[in-house]
Amino acid sequence: MNERRYDIDALRAIAMFLLIFYHLGISFTSVAPYIAFVQNKRFNDGIWYLLSVMNSWRIPLVFLISGIALRLAFQRRTKIEMFKERTKILIVPYIFGSVTFGAASLAIAFTYYEGWSDEYLWLWVITIFDGIHLWFLKNIFIYCLILIPFLNLISNKTAKETIFSKILNMPGGVFLFSIPVILEGHLLNANAYSEVVNYGRSYQEYANTSHGFLLGFIWFFLGVLLVSQGEVFWESNKRNWKTHLFVGFACYFYRFFNNFEDGFSLDNRLISFESFNFIFLMLGLGAVYLNK
């Protein structure tokens, strides 16, 4: 557990690249004007075929890796040090990025579509609370505040065999950890069109929704819990990545042939299971090829 995981470093960089690539791709679709993106004059919704491959798991992967990173950092730090460090690496970038890049991106988009207004100079007042593209940093910080006090109970520092490590050693046992993710998908099914709470309408609607917050917490917690099982977790990833590859693409192609662009009509429990498999595919590929 004390060894540095180069695969997690690499996956963190890959996850950030995918976020940037996805947001760049949005500008080439017809969706761009509706979510305050500057739309390219030559847009083509055919790019959704590529974007939809990653759309169900790109954000959950970020939360999982953040949970893994928190647990690995806890091996060498006290809880107080963890609080201070997480405040420094999450809240400072969140505030700075929100009032600068976040506000600027909105001002540019609004100016592009509607023309300049002096009111845009005050957009930072909104973005510091909303976060815009950095909303996930706010969520991760809240998850840290919730879980750091309980890390001693969750983290299994002595690397003893637990019920979770036994499950990971079982053939197909890793799929049991998809249950909370699938249950959240079921919750989304039940509340997608609720007028009482902004739970979220589609699986990919992560930003500033109850769906995105709860799903992010589940993946963050799984990151802490599973990496605490030590080598058993990494060996499970190495052993099962081909299975995750097959199941993930099977779910994706089911979406492909059933109007995958419009996620509103699809069962979110299936999408959540697809997401689970692609995420563990990435973990498996990382454990096999990137931890060097």
Where are these regions (language model features)?
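Alpha-helical transmembrane segments and their immediate juxtamembrane cytosolic regions
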Residues: M1-K292
